[in-house]
From Swiss-Prot:
Lineage: Bacteria, Pseudomonadati, Pseudomonadota, Gammaproteobacteria, Enterobacterales
InterPro entries documented for this protein: CSD, NA-bd_OB-fold, RNase_B_OB_dom, RNase_II, RNase_II/R, RNase_II/R_CS, RNase_II/RNase_R, RNR_Ribonuclease
Domain of life per record: Bacteria
Designated name of the protein: Exoribonuclease 2
Gene: rnb
GO cellular component terms, A-Z: cytosol
Broad enzyme group: hydrolase
Domain S1 motif: 561-643
Organism: Serratia proteamaculans (strain 568)
Segment forming the signal sequence: none
């Protein structure tokens, strides 16, 4: 009777259109219920029965209605699933497979089966890649996934590396060596093999891509020649090897090993500037004034060099700092080191006055055993020799930026525009509230930004610096010249690491076109998109492997009285994020560990402070001592508490 009733259909339609709806992202909890977060402002409760139809992170449309005097959201339509391709651990019961996604807020197993053609007998504990194929909001009875790739078994000590690389869909191995070109004979090369070029790297480095030579002009100025390995002599644009390098975009440096952008025969041998080996290079020569300024005699040219020494950062630093032990192999090399130190000092002084110099932060290096276990974590401070190489590389990248800008008007540029115009007022408010005069319009200029940074660098704490960081933009890769506020420079284009960065290979080809007076083509924007995306993925992979190794390393410290010095890097509503200064690990201090009475405490991300009874007890940038309360291996997270 009611089946085709138009009035009933109309009423249904009316009710549907009148039911309030919202769109948002599902946030799961460990207790079965969840929330629908709308625009980051408002959230609606999702009861456990409705949560069974969705997954944490799903973007959905939901209807709103009231139950027991509480407004709740009932997910109705899936807009964008949180999971599509993911990694997880396989469970096996009675030959039926399921997979638990490797994510801190996804605990439920998803039924799955291997795709056709995947011939692997999956066992419980195996790591695998899966693709979601069914979702309850799409009319399916439940969640379902296809297993598309076996990663490794549950007992593999190297799982942190293989799982992370699979998660981000990154290569596991160096590319195969394939046919390469002979160096282009039409590009004349100057013979610089008689000059005392040196390389300075870590002791374990095999892919040496920069060599340096300095000449004293006798009038207070110095002439610096930077010679850079020349992979584009062997890799033609558009060749199969070039396509491989373009896709990989960077050498991927992970704790314990790297996955090169180019075949190791090229990166570690044919192109590597090994001592006493004749190598083709792209070179830049520039005069550095007594005040550290770069003269306008910048010249790029192709050459051949023969490095006279493979020097090591720590040994060179020890010698320059007067620490007994290592000595330069000859007087000529000793003279080069001394002249390079002069270059470093005058350039560093110039950049302090006219640009910006990053504060020195240590690097943390994992020392690993054969099974991937962490034997120790070594803190490597940036020393004199590191600064020498850094100053020479920055100077040569400024030279490339100027030449590419003035001769072509394009290249691969690193661009950073300082404050986000939409957020600069927030920064002004924070600065003024802390006694620093600030003007939004001025802060958006390079000079104004540099002035503020110099002032903040002179402050006794990092509090203000970390507070205004949220209002700044991220560095970008661009084909058109633009300023780099972070370095305090009008333009910056890297070309000094072509073995490990595809963008530097592109700039090499453009610089060679200028040298040969040939027409050059502006790089496609797709190249910068690929570079930015790969840089993001490589950084995430490095962080993920690091988190896993930190969890392994700190596991046996949990529950002990061992104290660690830490710096507060973020304040959230739920507590503090801190970095352990002795090893670089990031840990979380939950609010209840700070003060037992929650109502007496305010953790404010807005002000970057923790207040107890109205008194500020912690600020972002503060140092404190902590102990490790717990290490959760399944989520690779470290929980700390303030030391008593």
């Amino acid at each position: 009777m009611f089946q085709d009733n138009p009035l009933l259909a109309q009423l249904k339609q009316q009710l549907h259109s009148q039911t309030p709806r919202v769109e948002g992202v599902v946030k799961g909890t460990e207790k079965g219920f969840g929330f629908l977060e709308v625009d980051g402002q408002k959230s609606y409760f999702i009861p456990p029965p409705y949560m069974k139809k969705v997954m944490h992170g799903d973007r959905v449309s939901a209807t709103l209605h009231t139950e027991k005097e509480r407004e709740i959201a009932e997910p109705e339509t899936l807009i964008e699933p949180f999971l599509s391709r993911f990694v997880g651990r396989v469970q096996k019961r009675d030959d039926r497979l399921s997979i638990v996604p490797d994510h801190p807020l996804l605990k439920d197993a998803i039924q799955c089966r291997p795709v056709r053609g995947l011939n692997h007998n999956f066992q419980a504990g195996d790591w695998a890649v899966a693709e979601m194929c069914r979702h309850p909001l799409k009319g399916d009875r439940g969640f379902n996934a296809d297993l598309t790739q076996f990663i490794t078994d549950g007992e593999d000590h190297l799982a942190p590396w293989w799982v992370t690389l699979a998660r981000h869909n990154l290569e596991k191995e160096a590319p195969e060596m394939i046919a390469i070109s002979e160096p282009d004979a039409s590009l004349p090369r100057e013979d610089l093999t008689a000059l005392n070029f040196v390389t300075i790297d870590s002791a374990s480095t095999e892919d040496m891509d920069d060599a340096l030579f300095v000449q004293d002009n006798g009038d207070g100025s110095l002439q610096l020649t930077i010679a850079i390995a020349d992979p584009t002599a062997y890799v033609e644009q558009g060749s199969p090897l070039d396509e491989i390098a373009r896709k990989r975009a960077f050498t991927n440096y992970l704790p314990g090993f790297n996955i090169p952008m180019l075949p190791r025969d090229l990166s570690d041998n044919l192109c590597s500037l090994r001592p006493n080996q004749r190598r083709p290079v792209l070179a830049c020569r520039v005069t550095i004034g007594a005040d550290g300024a770069l003269a306008d005699d910048i010249r790029f040219f192709a050459a051949e060099i023969e490095s006279k020494a493979k020097l090591v950062y720590d040994e060179v630093s020890d010698w320059l700092e007067g620490i007994a032990g290592w000595q330069p192999p000859s007087d000529d090399i000793a003279q080069q080191i001394t002249l390079l130190k002069r270059v470093c000092d005058v350039r560093n002084s110039w950049r302090h006055q006219h640009a910006l110099v990053f504060k020195d932060r240590p690097d943390y290096r994992f020392v690993l055993g054969e099974k991937g276990e962490v034997l120790e974590i070594v803190t490597e401070q940036r020393r004199t020799a590191n600064r020498i190489v850094e100053e020479c590389m920055i100077a040569s990248n400024v030279c490339a930026a100027i030449v590419l800008r003035d001769r072509l008007g394009f290249g691969i540029y690193n661009v950073h525009t300082g404050f986000d115009p939409l957020l600069v007022e927030q920064a002004v408010t924070v600065l003024q509230a802390n006694g620093v005069e600030a003007d939004a319009e001025k802060l958006l200029t390079l000079d104004g930004f540099c002035e503020l940074r110099r002032h903040l660098d002179s402050q006794p704490t990092q509090f203000l610096d970390s507070r205004i960081r949220r209002s700044q933009t991220y560095a970008e890769i661009s084909t058109t010249p633009g300023p780099h506020y972070g370095l305090g420079l009008e333009a910056y284009a890297t070309w000094t690491s072509p073995i490990r960065k595809y963008g530097d290979m592109v700039n090499h080809r453009l610089l060679k076109a200028i040298i040969a007076e040939q027409p050059a083509e502006k790089p496609q924007d797709e190249v910068t998109v690929q570079l930015a995306e790969r840089r993001r993925l490589n950084r995430m992979a490095e962080r993920d492997v690091g988190d896993w190794l930190y969890a392994r390393y700190l596991k046996d410290k949990a529950g002990t009285d061992e104290r660690f010095n830490a710096e507060i890097i973020d304040v959230t509503r739920g507590g503090l994020r801190v970095r352990l200064l002795d090893n670089g690990a990031v840990a979380f201090i939950p609010a209840p560990f700070i003060h037992a009475v929650r109502d007496e405490m305010v953790c404010s991300q807005e002000t970057g402070t923790v207040q107890i009874k109205g008194e500020v007890v912690y600020r972002q940038g503060d140092n404190l001592q902590v102990t490790i309360a717990e290490v959760r291996m399944e989520t690779r997270s470290v929980i700390a508490r303030p030391a008593a």
